Structure formats: structure tokens, C-alpha cells
Amino acid sequence: MTNIRKIHPLFKILNHSLIDLPTPSNISAWWNFGSLLGLCLAIQIFTGLFLAMHYTSDTMTAFSSVTHICRDVNYGWLIRYLHANGASMFFICLYLHVGRGIYYGSYTYSETWNIGILLLFAVMATAFMGYVLPWGQMSFWGATVITNLLSAIPYIGTNLVEWIWGGFSVDKATLTRFFAFHFILPFIIAALATTHLLFLHETGSNNPSGIPSDSDKIPFHPYYTIKDTLGFLMLILLLLLLTLFTPDLLGDPDNYSPANPLNTPPHIKPEWYFLFAYAILRSIPNKLGGVLALIMSILILAIMPFLHTSKQRSMMFRPISQIMFWTLVADLMVLTWIGGQPVEYPFTIIGQVASILYFTIILIFMPLASLIENKILKW
């Protein structure tokens, strides 16, 4: 008798995606981050739902409703900190996942890659709007500064900003709509993630060597379900360590002060996972130029398939490209550090050099390194 998972219309889809899926036999732990991102999304939706039951999106009560969640709701503090630190875990997995894609040449699956870029933008937008909701000082001023960037758009900029604000400043209308968008976006992300998987399963997974693995495939279950479960346990352990021992390690103390439009914090900065982009934005003196650089810092990923000049797909056997890749990683760490520093000498200069280097490595040095490697290998 045929197994029900192979004939039932619904189970059949799950079977082809999670059980009988032919998977390369040599994929490493770097391929775990896709499933870890799925787990992060599930944790965020689950904790977010319970937070939304107690949260009020009104400027008068938003801050005190978050205080109420932490003090009066049963395990409210745990749900709140799991949600806040869950966002950090989400971005750690996200950046490692993108880094893996760049290193092993996964961007050659252009549909999967482009949906991934859309997912990255959607997650960033969701995280930004979520940071506004507690209505602390950094929430308010972060929202003011970032939404104000749209005023750099010629002709329609000012009208666009006021339209997003729902008034002449960040106020009740802004908070209400941000809450609505923050609630709906994770479900859009889930739909996009399904599309991401759909396109991935059209081509099959890449592998560390970058060569086709059709002759050497193994079923996803039990081999990779076990491997993913280990990743799940490690992620949950790390999240619990962060949440239970140092819940405010990655947050900003300013956000424990209620939003006050009359008092500007000394250093306005976003959450740590946006600092690299914020540093690029700040390093350009022109407002419109800064906004364009900010968008391009992520959108540059979309042109990666066109910048691939190597005859090999993966960087596994390309030492010069590996040096370029790790220089890029170090550069991003420098940008993250600079984004959290005040706008003064020498941080401004370091930020400008690191920003130029970021674009130069991706646009010039990496394609050039690939061409040199081709030449050395006489390809």
C-alpha cells in the first residue's frame, strides 16, 4: 500500500519539501540557516501575537502598556524579551545566510536570490517598525530620523513624509499604522519564504563545492532533519541565554525613557543590526546621496549574479576571492562599530573609508580577483 504522505494532496507537498526531497550529500552546517530563519519567524509570530494581546498602539498608553506587559502579565517579561532578542537572532541568521550565499555562489539561482533580497527588505522594514512600538526615546527619534530621509526625494519628498506620518510629525497616526504594518508583514514574509523555497526546489540546493550534485543525492529525512534539529536546539539555547541572563545587552538604555518630542537623545542610533547601513548613510554629507547609498548597500546584492566572472561557482577553491570575501566581512564589522559611534573625528573618516571600501570590494575587487584566478588556472 502506498504511504499516505505520497498520495494525499496536502501531505504530498510537505513530503516533497521536507521528507523525500533529494539533497546534496555534502552540504555543511552553513546550509542550516534557512531552517533556522523559519524557526526565528515562527518564534517572532508566536511571541508577537501574545504581545499584541496586551499592547495598545496609542501615544498616551503605548509605553505604559509595554511596562504593564513586563510587570503584570504572566511571563510577560519573558515574551517581550524573547521577541526583542528573537529579532537579533533573526538578523544574525539572516546575515550568515546571505554571507553563505555569496561565499558559495548561491546567487546564480537568480529567482531564489531575488526573492531572498525582497525578504531581507521586508524583515528590515518589520524590525524598524517594531522598534518604534514601545514608544521610548529611541523609538520616537529613530522613527523621526529614518522616515525623514524620504524628504530627500526630489519634488514629492515632503508630501511623502507627511503622508507616511499621517500628520506633520511622528504621532498617534504614525504609531497606529506602524503597529498595523508590523503585525501584517510577518505573514507576508512567511508567504515570500514559501515562494523562496518553491524556487529553490525547482533547481535543488547548491553545495560547498559548487558543482552539480545530481549523481550524489540523499533524502532530506532523516539525515538533514536531525541536522536541523541540532541547529534548532543551539539557536534556542543561545536565545534563552541572551534573554534570561542579559536581556538588555543589545538594546538601548534611552528606550527606557518615554518618548519626548522636546528632548533629543545625545546619540540617535538604530538597533545593532542596522548600524552598518546607518554608517554608510552618515558617511555621505549629501542627504539624497546618503539615502541612495543606504538603499544601494542592500540592493547591490541584486547585481551580484552579473558580477560573477569566475569559471568556478563556489569560493571553496579560490583563495584570492576568499581574501576579498573576508575583507568584506571585516569591513562590515567596522561599519557596524562606526554606526554606533558619535559623528566626530576620527569616526567620520573611518566610516567614509569603510563605506567606499564596501562598494569597491563588491563592484571591483571581487570580479577582478575572479578574473585573476581564471588566468592562473589557464581557464
UniProtKB/Swiss-Prot annotation:
Residues involved in a ubiquinone binding: H201
Cofactor(s) listed in the protein's UniProt record: heme b
Gene3D superfamilies: Cytochrome Bc1 Complex, Chain C
Transmembrane segments: 33-53, 77-98, 113-133, 178-198, 226-246, 288-308, 320-340, 347-367
Gene Ontology annotations of biological process type: mitochondrial electron transport, ubiquinol to cytochrome c
Keyword NAD attributed: no
Topology relative to the membrane: Multi-pass membrane protein
UniProt entry keywords in alphabetical sequence: Electron transport, Heme, Iron, Membrane, Metal-binding, Mitochondrion, Mitochondrion inner membrane, Respiratory chain, Transmembrane, Transmembrane helix, Transport, Ubiquinone
Residues where heme b b566 binds: H97, H196
Pfam families according to UniProt: Cytochrom_B_C, Cytochrome_B
Protein family membership: Belongs to the cytochrome b family.
Functional summary from the UniProt entry: Component of the ubiquinol-cytochrome c reductase complex (complex III or cytochrome b-c1 complex) that is part of the mitochondrial respiratory chain. The b-c1 complex mediates electron transfer from ubiquinol to cytochrome c. Contributes to the generation of a proton gradient across the mitochondrial membrane that is then used for ATP synthesis.
Protein name: Cytochrome b
